Amino acid sequence: MDTMITTPLILILITCGANSQTVKPDTASESDQPTWSNPLFTYPEGCTLDKLSKVNASQLRCPRIFDDENRGLIAYPTSIRSLSVGNDLGDIHTQGNHIHKVLYRTICSTGFFGGQTIEKALVKMKLSTKEAGAYDTTTAAALYFPAPRCQWYTDNVQNDLIFYYTTQKSVLRDPYTRDFLDSDFIGGKCTKSPCQTHWSNVVWMGDAGIPACDSSQEIKAHLFVDKISNRVVKATSYGHHPWGLHQACMIEFCGQQWIRTDLGDLISVVYNSGSEILSFPKCEDKTVGMRGNLDDFAYLDDLVKASESREECLEAHAEIISTNSVTPYLLSKFRSPHPGINDVYAMHKGSIYHGMCMTVAVDEVSKDRTTYRAHRATSFTKWERPFGDEWEGFHGLHGNNTTIIPDLEKYVAQYKMSMMEPMSIKSVPHPSILALYNETDVSGISIRKLDSFDLQSLHWSFWPTISALGGIPFVLLLAVAACCCWSGRPPTPSVPQSIPMYHLANRS
């Protein structure tokens, strides 16, 4: 191996070992870690539609996969208190609303001969966080375009209505910093509601969320110690990813001392029947944040494995982006194999939906595949379908009469081909664009910025175009041509009764 490569690796291992704590618990025990770490299947529970939002294909993320091989390690019973969401997802979601400011504009163009073109446009208005809370809002169902205001021989007569309305949107809340977290926010986070979003006319407002410094209830867990060095390697508990302790250190937060794990979780650990408290050297910095904000490479020691599964997911992601389509099989690659709070994905009518939800380990699937039994459960449960129908579920699960689970179907010799059927992916529209009712008298509906209203984008009919080109000169030219043609005709013999002139005028 090249010395340029080995030297950094040795330094990493030395650094990781420097903070490790040596302990000698009194009682060893069997851990149930292998039971849930690689279960038959995992599936979300309680993941309702209000916890999901549309994302583009580029926003899909492959799950972390942790190596739970415990060779050379001894498990000891312990209790863990976490200043994180622990096994309960309730506190991590904060309910709120997108507040939109949109101008509904009806445009009428009337030609010289009375022909009309009516266009309707949504015009984005700038909305500040101060303005967002100052006006009464309505719901999306109450929106409407104003009646056209038309004037003879005039183009682009506008009739405008401004609406402030809300659409439901839940976001995540960092239990440490109390920041609101969502890809809609500038920089992905916001410290205080209301929050500015990437869209100039949309602001997010939500409730206060979880109180600061709340810790979860004590969790029964296991502490894993190296047999030879007696150094603490990790801690585990059902429904949570392993807490890596290779680079753990002590940090003060909310007036208490906490262990900051490799991925940034804050926990406290007691062992030997509660008589001993696990501690580490003091952290060199005071960074706190939701897990995953710290250096992920800490898990390269022994907690991240299954590079094949990770590579399969990355290849699936590349295929989805390049083809702009997804199959249930490809979507199944984004399922986390570990229970706990994970990213979940579903497809519905060409859109990809994403959420952060609690997933459970599935120990058994019924013979007809319609139900499953979760780990430690005594009864079977139906698969949750977030869209209320009997076809689409999470991570490629689909089917009506027969439930097809791509992760399990791939092992069947005669697998169902429906899991290979591609679905075209729709891009996520601007959040202010809604299903626009039964607008039958309109040549086009578009959304525009206030400062870029473009007359060339109008959809013209023939007669208003005449007026735009200059109706009167055009009509005069026609009249002159008609007179010339008329005067050039040979004279006709007189008749006893002539056609009244107003008849001739009506025909021209």
Curated annotation (Swiss-Prot):
Keyword vocabulary terms for this entry: Glycoprotein, Host-virus interaction, Membrane, Signal, Transmembrane, Transmembrane helix, Viral attachment to host cell, Viral envelope protein, Virion, Virus entry into host cell
The keyword Transmembrane belongs to this UniProt entry's keyword annotation: yes
UniProt superkingdom: Viruses
Side Intravirion, residues: 483-508
GO aspect biological process, one term: virion attachment to host cell
Family from the record: Belongs to the novirhabdovirus glycoprotein family.
Region forming the signal peptide: 1-20
InterPro entries: Rhabdo_glycop_CD (IPR055447), Rhabdo_glycop_FD (IPR001903), Spike_prot (IPR002417)
Keyword flag Transcription: no
Membrane-topology annotation of the record: Single-pass type I membrane protein
Subunit composition and interactions: Homotrimer.
Membrane-crossing residue ranges in chain numbering: 462-482
Subcellular location per the Swiss-Prot or TrEMBL entry: Virion membrane
Topological domain spans for side Virion surface: 21-461
Organism field: Infectious hematopoietic necrosis virus (strain WRAC)
The organism's taxonomic lineage, starting at the top: Viruses, Riboviria, Orthornavirae, Negarnaviricota, Haploviricotina
Gene Ontology, cellular component aspect: membrane; viral envelope; virion membrane
Name of the molecule in the record: Glycoprotein
Function statement: Binds to specific receptor at cellular surface, bringing about the attachment of the virus particle to the cell. Plays a major role in the determination of host range restriction and virulence. Class I viral fusion protein. Responsible for penetration of the viral nucleocapsid into the cell cytoplasm by mediating the fusion of the membrane of the endocytosed virus particle with the endosomal membrane. Low pH in endosomes induce an irreversible conformational change in G, releasing a fusion hydrophobic peptide.
Sugar-bearing residue positions: N56, N400, N401, N438
